């Protein structure tokens, strides 16, 4: 009975270790992906967008300032 219990403990510890290693690898992969995305976003800030064209407003047709 003792060998079965020790085998079960070893098996559970192995599963726990495997889970920790996989979660660590996923965390590293996410961190490198986020790091790459951050670098791509910084490149966008190095080159500012050109200014947009001004909005055309036609001259006012009011009679203000034109006399009677």
Swiss-Prot record:
Quaternary structure and partners: Interacts with MIK2 (via extracellular leucine-rich repeat domain); this interaction triggers the formation of complex between MIK2 and the BAK1/SERK3 and SERK4 coreceptors, and subsequent BAK1 activation by phosphorylation.
Superkingdom, taxonomy of origin: Eukaryota
Induction per the UniProt record: Induced by cold, drought and salt stress, but repressed by pathogenic bacteria Pseudomonas syringae pv. tomato (Pst) DC3000, jasmonate (MeJA), ethylene (ET) and salicylic acid (SA), mainly in shoots.
Tissue specificity as recorded in UniProt: Mostly expressed in stems and flowers and, to a lower extent, in seedlings shoots, roots, siliques, seeds and leaves.
A Gene Ontology cellular-component term: apoplast
GO biological process: defense response to bacterium; response to bacterium; response to cold; response to ethylene; response to jasmonic acid; response to salicylic acid; response to salt stress; response to water deprivation
Compartments where located: Cell membrane; Secreted, Extracellular space, Apoplast
Keywords: Apoplast, Cell membrane, Cleavage on pair of basic residues, Membrane, Secreted, Signal
UniProt-annotated stretches for the region Disordered: 33-68
Lineage of the organism: Eukaryota, Viridiplantae, Streptophyta, Embryophyta, Tracheophyta
Organism: Arabidopsis thaliana (Mouse-ear cress)
Motif (SCOOP motif) on chain: 54-68
Function: Brassicaceae-specific phytocytokine (plant endogenous peptide released into the apoplast) perceived by MIK2 in a BAK1/SERK3 and SERK4 coreceptors-dependent manner, that modulates various physiological and antimicrobial processes including growth prevention and reactive oxygen species (ROS) response regulation. Promotes the expression of immune-related marker genes (e.g. WRKY30, WRKY33 and CYP81F2) in a MIK2-dependent manner. Inhibits root growth and regulates root meristems. Prevents general growth and development. Exhibits antibacterial effects against Pseudomonas syringae pv.
Ranges of Pro residues composition bias in the record: 48-57
Observed effect of gene inactivation: Slightly increased growth and fresh weight.
Family statement drawn from the similarity comment of this UniProt entry: Belongs to the serine rich endogenous peptide (SCOOP) phytocytokine family.
GO MF annotation terms: LRR domain binding; receptor serine/threonine kinase binding
Protein's name according to its UniProt entry: Serine rich endogenous peptide 13
Motif (SxS motif essential for MIK2 binding): 60-62
Residues of the signal peptide: 1-31
Listed Basic and acidic residues bias regions: 37-47
